[in-house]
Swiss-Prot record:
The lineage of its organism: Eukaryota, Fungi, Fungi incertae sedis, Mucoromycota, Mucoromycotina. GO terms for biological process: defense response to bacterium. The keyword Cell inner membrane does not apply. Keywords: Antibiotic, Antimicrobial, Disulfide bond, Secreted. Sillucin is an antimicrobial agent produced by the thermophilic fungus Rhizomucor pusillus in liquid culture; it is effective against Gram-positive bacteria at the level of RNA metabolism. It is found in: Secreted. This is Sillucin. GO terms for cellular component: extracellular region. Disulfide bonds join 2-7, 12-24, 13-30, 14-21.
Length: 30
């Protein structure tokens, strides 16, 4: 599932991990 838009970094849709943006390869914290 994707995280809410408020948790998304640089407009990327994130995968299962809440700390990893799979599409862009950017780590971030909500």
């Amino acid at each position: 599932a994707c995280l809410p838009n408020s948790c998304v970094s640089k407009g990327c849709c994130c995968g299962b991990s809440g700390y990893w943006c799979r599409q862009c390869g950017i780590k971030y914290t909500c």
